Amino acid sequence: SLFQLGKMILQETGKNPAASYGAYGCNCGVLGRGKPKDATDRCCYVHKCCKKKLTGCDPKKDRYSYSWKDKTIVCGENNPCLKELCECDKAVAICLRENLNTYNKKYRYHLKPFCKKADPC
């Protein structure tokens, strides 16, 4: 669910997920689409592609189980789609943490109409 994704992002980056990534670049947030502006935006692009491959669950609403052990996200789910959704969310949270040094405040509220068409997933 979006709540769980936000919690993972907060745990990994220490940033408020809605304020920091809700409208970042061309791909972060609900309306995201377009050629990534930087490494952080690319994390969101890859995340959208990851979620597009899912079948049998709703990435926005369906909840999955995961735990936070030794500062590591551990997905624990028997349902294959929910396990994959958890892994997609885990990957983007880690990617955002790994690219904190390239986070650019000028892309925090980037206007989506200015985004160029992205390559298909």
From Swiss-Prot:
Write down the position(s) of the site called Important residue of the cationic membrane-docking site (MDoS). 105, 108
Q: What is this protein called?
A: Basic phospholipase A2 homolog 2
An example molecular function term from Gene Ontology annotations? calcium ion binding
Show the GO cellular component annotation of the record. extracellular region
Functional note: Snake venom phospholipase A2 homolog that lacks enzymatic activity. Is myotoxic and displays edema-inducing activities in mouse paw. Also displays cytotoxic activity against some cell lines, and antimicrobial activities against E.coli, C.albicans and Leishmania. A model of myotoxic mechanism has been proposed: an apo Lys49-PLA2 is activated by the entrance of a hydrophobic molecule (e.g. fatty acid) at the hydrophobic channel of the protein leading to a reorientation of a monomer.
Query: What CDD domains has UniProt attached to this entry?
Result: PLA2c (cd00125)
| Assembly, per entry | Homodimer; non-covalently linked (probable alternative/compact dimer conformation in solution).
Under InterPro entries, the record lists: PLipase_A2, PLipase_A2_Asp_AS, PLipase_A2_dom, PLipase_A2_dom_sf, PLipase_A2_His_AS
User: Which Cys residues form disulphide pairs?
Assistant: 26-115, 28-44, 43-95, 49-121, 50-88, 57-81, 75-86
Q: Name one GO biological process term.
A: arachidonate secretion
Q: In which tissues is it expressed?
A: Expressed by the venom gland.
Q: Where does the record place it?
A: Secreted
Question: Which UniProt keywords are listed?
Answer: Antibiotic, Antimicrobial, Disulfide bond, Myotoxin, Secreted, Toxin
Family (UniProt): Belongs to the phospholipase A2 family. Group II subfamily. K49 sub-subfamily.
Q: What is its main location?
A: secreted
Q: Where is this site: Hydrophobic membrane-disruption site (MDiS)?
A: 111, 114
Q: Give site residues, Cationic membrane-docking site (MDoS).
A: 112, 117
Lineage runs: Eukaryota, Metazoa, Chordata, Craniata, Vertebrata
Species of provenance = Bothrops brazili (Brazil's lancehead)
Which residues lie within the region annotated Important for membrane-damaging activities in eukaryotes and bacteria?
105-117
